[in-house]
């Protein structure tokens, strides 16, 4: 299979996983917010397929999921998530393409992606809430990006490196 075709097929797979993975939380928004199941396939897509594919999957996943399952709500949550997850896929892919493919390199790619993605989410929330006449405070940002997201952050910091390292060890990734 040609390299670009493989990346396209894998991106479709990550999109599909992102569509169904939230069902593991029972569609309960509070649990979904804590675990962030849609973030995992986007981060993996950035690592495995590269920045453009990861960014595109991240950008289209929330709106497509809304169209199919009416979750997450498109405005402002889904749109802010789309920018956040596009950033996850973009940054993880860009940084990972420039570092050694070992555990240190995985973390050097994952942590900036998580930080920048959450900052982009906050900026998107400020803009989207401002457009609708609402407000998004710094306290809401801290709660949404950090405090409520601690379980997701911990899971991402554990599982993403394990998955990428296992794929390298199995020689599935080069």
Regions found by a protein language model. Give the residues of each.
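Membrane-embedded alpha-helical hairpins and interfacial helices in multi-pass inner-membrane proteins
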Residues: 27-32, 70-79, 99-174
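Hydrophobic transmembrane alpha-helices
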Residues: 1-48, 52-56
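Interfacial aromatic-anchored transmembrane helix boundaries in multi-pass membrane proteins
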Residues: 20-37, 60-95, 129, 139
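A cytosolic-side transmembrane-helix exit/cap motif
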Residues: 54, 58, 127-130
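Alpha-helical transmembrane segments in multi-pass membrane proteins
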Residues: 10, 14-18, 42, 46, ...
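Hydrophobic transmembrane alpha-helices of multi-pass small-molecule transporters
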Residues: 40-43, 62, 66, 85, ...
């Amino acid at each position: 299979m040609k390299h670009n075709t493989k990346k396209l097929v894998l991106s479709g797979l990550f999109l599909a996983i992102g569509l169904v993975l939230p069902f593991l939380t029972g569609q309960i928004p509070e649990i979904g917010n804590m675990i962030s199941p849609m973030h995992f396939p986007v981060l993996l897509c950035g690592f495995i397929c590269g920045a453009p594919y990861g960014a595109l999957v991240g950008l289209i996943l929330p709106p497509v999921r809304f169209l199919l399952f009416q979750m997450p709500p498109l405005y402002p949550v889904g749109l802010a998530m789309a920018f956040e997850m596009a950033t996850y896929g973009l940054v993880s892919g860009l940084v990972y393409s420039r570092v050694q493919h070992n555990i240190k390199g995985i973390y050097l790619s994952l942590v900036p992606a998580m930080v920048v993605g959450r900052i982009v989410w906050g900026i998107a929330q400020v803009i989207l809430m401002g457009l609708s006449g609402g407000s998004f405070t710094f306290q809401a940002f801290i709660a949404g990006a950090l405090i409520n997201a601690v379980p997701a952050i911990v899971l991402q910091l554990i599982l993403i490196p394990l998955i990428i390292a296992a794929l390298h060890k199995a020689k599935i990734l080069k």
